UniProtKB/Swiss-Prot annotation:
Record-linked InterPro entries: Glyco_trans_ALG6/ALG8
EC number: 2.4.1.267
Key words, A-Z: Endoplasmic reticulum, Glycosyltransferase, Membrane, Transferase, Transmembrane, Transmembrane helix
Transmembrane segments: 114-133, 161-181, 235-255, 296-316, 322-342, 385-405, 418-438, 441-461
Listed name of the protein: Probable dolichyl pyrophosphate Man9GlcNAc2 alpha-1,3-glucosyltransferase
Topology class, membrane: Multi-pass membrane protein
Main location (coarse class): endoplasmic reticulum
Subcellular location(s) per record: Endoplasmic reticulum membrane
Similarity annotation: Belongs to the ALG6/ALG8 glucosyltransferase family.
Natural source organism: Drosophila melanogaster
Disruption phenotype: Larval lethality. Larvae lacking maternal gny present patterning and morphological defects, including the failure to form a normal head skeleton, a discontinuous cuticle and irregular body contours. Larvae lacking maternal and zygotic gny show severe reduction in cuticle deposition and a complete failure of denticle formation and melanization.
Annotated pathway: Protein modification; protein glycosylation
Function text: Adds the first glucose residue to the lipid-linked oligosaccharide precursor for N-linked glycosylation. Transfers glucose from dolichyl phosphate glucose (Dol-P-Glc) onto the lipid-linked oligosaccharide Man(9)GlcNAc(2)-PP-Dol. Involved in cuticle differentiation.
Length: 475
């Protein structure tokens, strides 16, 4: 089994290395470039400026040009990578002069930093979670799960293609999930706090962790035990936050400035054509014309909480392993569909529990994971990553078919037809978008069709996930 696991890991690394050869976000596209330049610029800022200046606008730190808008752990990571880059070539992070810097050597360095995070954090974390699931369920599915995780094109195309470090926050979150399954609650609190302090979008996973851990505390045999347990978990969370935020804790204004950067209400409810409810509604009813940003933020918070509460209340009352994974799936999907300032890439947060729910619902989850890649195609097409996206998705589906003994499609005809219709629809839209030019009057027609189609799928999966959590014997 170890040799097969190792082979799957090398398969995943090979796919990542191949995708790394392709273009990235903002290549040769001045003046703003893209996410690649954002990551490079954060290295420039953190290496050259004092810690207290990282989130503050100044002549040396123009926040309008890719200002740092992720939590402190991302900033520390940028500093580390920037220091390594500066030792290779100081031009990589030279203050002001390195803006928009591009070279073959720099691309190799930046790509290597993402693959290093895959090797050191993401893949080991996913393997730990696969082993933890096997232990929790007394099964032997780790090769099936880990192979599909390693081959999942969504994370690979965004991190190793488009260019981000989702692998780090997702890796920490995976370790936290594994800790929950192993009933190591202090470790779960610690690693989830790390994930949240790397990317604030990990809030998508926060309610299930809160509900599960609070439920465990409430279930203690005495009030004294409850106080002791909740105090220890709170100490882990607050202590980790304090250590990571210590450079800013001396000033309330400094803390508020960081929070302002992390939650920028002024940007609007969504950017581009993201596959969530608000983008779909905006097709027929222009939100910005009728609702202010502040009002829309409150609407989003209310809708997200209403959509998330049932699954988490049930998890609080009935804490099972499958129920926890379903709560992560349902809650993160509710956040994606209804929350404020959603990006295409944040669907990866729902893909994380979906990859491990393949264990229980392989056919449903493989379709969902394919839709996640489909929903990001406009973004990937802009980065000239459409070819690797299609090839990687087909390969992912074929790898799943190699484990076809787990499939139920052969004897569940409604599910088979639904899956076939969805796949034909997605293929047809992709082919049409490549062969039929959008009308001049509607240049974003195809991205909009992709986002609305994906949103419809995601909403149905959200309903399905809640039905499963409330009715399935597994949960």
């Amino acid at each position: 089994m170890r040799s097969e696991i190792l082979a799957s890991a090398f398969l995943g690394l090979a796919v990542r290395s191949i995708i790394s050869l392709y273009s990235y976000s903002g290549f040769d596209s001045p003046p703003m470039h893209g996410d690649y330049e954002a990551q490079r610029h954060w290295q420039e800022i953190t290496v050259n400026l004092a810690v207290g200046e990282w989130y503050t606008n100044s002549s040396n730190n123009d926040l309008q040009y890719w200002g740092l808008d992720y939590p402190p752990l991302t900033a520390y990571h940028s500093y580390l990578v920037g220091r390594i880059g500066a030792s290779i070539d100081p031009r990589f992070v030279e203050l002001h002069k390195s803006r928009g810097f591009e070279s073959k050597e720099h691309k190799r360095f930046m790509r290597a930093t993402v693959v290093s995070a895959d090797v050191l954090i993401y893949l080991p974390a996913m393997l730990l979670l696969a082993y933890s699931l096997d232990k929790a369920f007394r099964s032997d599915d780790k090769l099936f799960l880990f192979t599909l995780v390693a081959a999942y094109p969504g994370q690979t195309l965004i991190d190793n293609g488009h260019f981000q470090y989702n692998n780090i926050s997702l890796g920490f979150a995976a370790v936290a999930i594994a800790a929950i399954l192993r009933r190591r609650f202090y470790a779960a609190a610690f690693f989830f706090t790390l994930a949240l302090n790397y990317k604030q979008m990990e809030l998508y996973h926060s309610l299930p962790f809160f509900a599960f851990l609070l439920g465990e505390c409430v279930s203690q045999k005495s009030f004294a035990s409850f106080i002791a347990e909740i105090s220890r978990i709170a100490a882990v969370v607050l202590g980790t936050f304090a250590i990571l935020w210590v450079p800013w804790l001396g000033s309330l204004q400094a803390v508020l400035q960081v929070l302002h950067r992390l939650f920028p209400v002024a940007r609007g409810v969504f950017e581009d054509k993201v596959a969530n409810v608000w983008c779909a509604v905006n097709v027929v009813w222009k939100l910005k014309k009728h609702i202010s940003n502040d009002q829309m933020a409150l609407v989003c918070i209310a809708c997200t909480l209403i959509a998330s509460l049932p699954t988490n209340v049930l998890l609080f009352r009935r804490r099972t392993n499958v129920g926890f994974l379903l709560a992560l799936f349902n809650t993160s999907l509710a956040f994606f569909l209804f929350s404020f300032q959603v990006h295409e890439k944040t669907i990866l947060l729902t893909a994380l529990p979906a990859l491990f729910l393949l264990k229980c619902w392989p056919d449903e989850m493989i379709l969902f994971l394919e839709v996640t890649v489909f929903s990001m195609l406009p973004l990937l097409a802009r980065d000239e990553l459409l070819v690797p996206a299609v090839v990687a998705t087909v390969a992912f589906h074929l790898i799943f078919k190699c484990f076809d003994s787990k499939s139920k499609l052969s004897n569940e005809y409604p599910l088979k037809y639904i899956a076939n219709i969805s796949q034909i629809l997605m293929i047809s839209v992709v082919v049409a978008s490549l062969t039929v030019p959008a009308p001049t009057k509607y240049p974003d027609l195809w991205p909009l069709i992709i986002s609305v189609t994906s949103c419809g799928h995601f909403f149905l999966f959200f309903l399905w996930g809640n039905v499963q959590q409330f009715s399935s014997k597994l949960s």
